């Protein structure tokens, strides 16, 4: 047992004993029969039909191919390829989509390496984009970016900030989600998909990270108990979100197209998982 595993077990024990609340324990008499699915084949037609849109994003990456070399081995606050948090296609797609769509506003829930790619695209494009980042402890330092663009950072959780803290988003704006990934009552995932997305107008570009659809989560992530992509699956199947790009699908099903373009020259570490999903909102729930 390694140190990280021991820490998780001690955290679970303290939670179950009621000493502290460091996670969630949900008793279920049939838990032993639960097997996480390897994938969701019923969703595959949606992804296959979206391949032309995925190809357009690869073409956009080609139009900004100079970043392949420019972000190689850089130092903060510049984005870099040599990290596993927001690797390869994730970073390239985020940069290219900001440069191409020129959003007036980006709201990011969960910040770090993704913020560096988004901010650099804003700066390189000479855009007047306003950025709001909500994260109690960003995975990568983003403090040095505030002097280069209109960037506001709320170092708190979405639960504590409240959904009212989010500014209004218009068609063409971006909502970038890389939060707790825990779909439980009251979590940031619950608030985002249950309260924020239902009132967004049509045409907002939404990003959700660590989404492997239509595949399941990696086996090595089983201990994390992520459930967010099940919520994303419902939004896709119901038509509330229309696919724009999916790193996992593109890397595993469009490998030839990736290899033929600039994205194929981006270094990706052996332990990295490319898992960005971009989609466009279809419109608000009536009356929201």
Regions found by a protein language model. Name each.
Residues 1-288:
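A short alpha-helical cap/connector motif
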